[in-house]
Regions:
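Glycine-rich Rossmann-fold phosphate-binding loop(s) that bind the pyrophosphate
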Residues: 22-23
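N-terminal Rossmann-fold NAD(P) dinucleotide-binding loop
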Residues: 26-27
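Aromatic pocket-lining residues of Rossmann-like dinucleotide-binding sites
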Residues: 33
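Conserved N-terminal Rossmann-fold NAD(P) cofactor-binding segment
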Residues: 47-84, 301-309
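Rossmann-like NAD(P)-binding element
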Residues: 65-126
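Rossmann-like NAD(P)(H) cofactor-binding subdomain of soluble oxidoreductases
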Residues: 100-165
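C-terminal substrate-binding/catalytic lobe of Rossmann-fold NAD(P)-dependent dehydrogenases
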Residues: 145-152, 160-309
C-alpha cells in the first residue's frame, strides 16, 4: 500500500506556471503565486534575458525563505516554458500618464501575435492568461493567432476592476459585499452590473463607476504603473485553473453567441477551472447592463477591425 501511495504521489502532476513578460506585473504575479501556491516550477521568458534571469534568481531566494524550493528559471528562450499548466502573458508596452489603454493596441497586437506563435511552439497544451493591454483586444489576438480552443485563452481585466469597485464601496460604508462586478471592456466603457450586485445599502453608482474607471490612471500618474492589484487578480485566476476551484469571476472570454454576441473577447461572468473557461454564465442581465455590454462589444469590434481582424 505504501509503495502504491508513493507511486501515485509521484504521478501527481507537477504544477508549472510560465510567464512571457518578466516586468513589473509578470514578476509580481510570480512573487504572489510563489507565496500563495505550491508550484513546482516557474519559468520566466522576456526579451530582456538578464531581467528574466535576475527575476528567477531573486524569486528562488525568496522561496527558500519560505522553505520552498521550486525550480525557477528565466531567459529569453521559449523552450523553458515547456509543460506549463498555464502561461501568463504580460509582454508588451504599458501606458504612460495621459495615454489610454487602447493607445497600446497596435504595438502590443504585433507583440502578442509573435508571442502566440512562440507559445504554441514551446508549450501548446498550456492555458493562456492574457494580461497585456488593451486586454480584451489582446485576448482576442492571442486566441486567433494561437489557434487554441476558446476555453483555453482568457484575459484578466474586470477581476481587477471589481476589486477596485469593492474597495470603493467599502470606503462608502457599503456592508456585506457578496458580489460587486465590473463587466464589459477593461477600459472606459466598463460598467457596474446592477443586475448582479449583491450588497447592503448600495449607493448611487454613477460616481462610484467614474472612480473605478479612472483610478488606474491615478495610480500610474503617481507610481508609474499598477502591479499589486493586477497580481492578486491574476493570482485568483491562476489559482482557479491550477486548483480547479471552478470559481465564478468576471473574465475576458471569447463569446460565440453568449449574451447575443460573437467573435469578440469581453468581460462577462465565467467559471474558471482546470480547463480554463469551464462555463460562461449567461445571467439574464437587465436592459441597462445589456446596453452597456453592447456598447463595450461595439467599441472592441471597431478596434479589432482596425487591427485587421
Ligand atoms: N489586464 C490588466 O488588468 C493589466 C494590469 C496591469 C498591467 N497590464 C498590462 O500588462 C503589460 C505589462 O505591464 P508592466 O507594467 O509589467 O510592463 P513592464 O514594461 O514592466 O513589463 C513588460 C515586459 O514585457 C517585455 N516584453 C516586451 N516585448 C516582449 C516580447 N516580444 N516578448 C517577451 N517579452 C517582451 C519587456 O521586456 C518587459 O520586461 C502592459 O501592457 C500593461 O498595460 C494589464
Ligand atoms: O490601467 C493600466 O494601464 C494598467 C491596468 O490595466 C490597470 O487597470 O491597472
Amino acid at each position: 500500500m505504501y509503495f502504491n501511495f508513493v507511486k501515485e504521489q509521484s504521478e501527481v502532476a507537477k504544477m508549472k506556471i510560465g510567464f512571457v513578460g518578466a516586468g513589473r506585473v509578470g514578476s509580481t504575479i510570480a512573487f504572489t503565486c510563489l507565496q500563495q501556491l505550491d508550484v513546482e516550477e516557474i519559468a520566466l521568458v522576456d526579451i530582456m534575458e538578464n531581467l528574466a534571469i535576475g527575476e528567477a534568481m531573486d524569486l528562488a531566494h525568496a522561496a527558500a525563505g519560505l522553505g520552498k524550493y521550486p525550480e525557477i528559471v528565466g531567459g529569453s528562450d521559449y523552450s523553458i516554458l515547456e509543460g506549463s499548466d498555464i502561461v501568463v502573458v504580460t509582454a508588451g508596452s504599458a501606458r504612460k500618464p495621459g495615454m489610454s489603454r487602447l493607445d497600446l493596441a497596435m504595438k502590443n497586437a504585433g507583440i502578442i501575435k509573435d508571442v502566440a506563435r512562440k507559445i504554441m511552439e514551446s508549450s501548446p497544451e498550456s492555458k493562456i492568461l492574457v494580461i497585456t493591454n488593451p486586454v480584451d483586444l489582446m485576448t482576442y489576438v492571442m486566441w486567433k493567432e494561437s489557434g487554441k480552443s476558446r476555453n483555453e485563452v482568457f484575459g484578466m481585466g474586470n477581476m481587477l476592476d471589481s476589486m477596485r469597485l469593492k474597495r470603493t464601496l467599502h470606503e462608502l460604508g457599503v456592508k456585506n459585499i457578496n458580489k460587486a462586478w465590473i463587466l464589459g471592456e477593461h477600459g472606459d466603457s466598463m460598467f457596474i452590473s446592477r443586475t448582479l450586485i449583491d450588497a447592503e445599502n448600495v449607493p448611487e453608482l454613477e460616481k462610484v463607476l467614474s472612480e473605478v474607471r479612472f483610478v488606474a490612471a491615478e495610480v500610474i500618474k503617481r507610481k508609474g504603473a499598477t502591479f499589486y492589484g493586477p497580481a492578486i487578480a491574476a493570482y485568483r485566476m491562476i489559482n482557479a485553473v491550477l486548483n480547479n476551484t471552478k470559481e465564478e469571476m468576471p473574465a475576458s472570454v471569447i463569446l460565440k453567441g453568449e449574451f447575443g454576441f460573437s467573435d469578440v473577447s469581453v468581460g462577462v461572468p465565467a467559471i474558471i477551472g482546470k480547463n480554463g473557461v469551464e462555463k460562461i454564465v449567461e445571467y439574464p442581465l437587465d436592459p441597462q447592463d445589456m446596453e452597456n455590454l453592447r456598447n463595450s462589444v461595439k467599441l472592441l469590434k471597431e478596434r479589432l477591425k482596425e487591427l485587421g481582424y
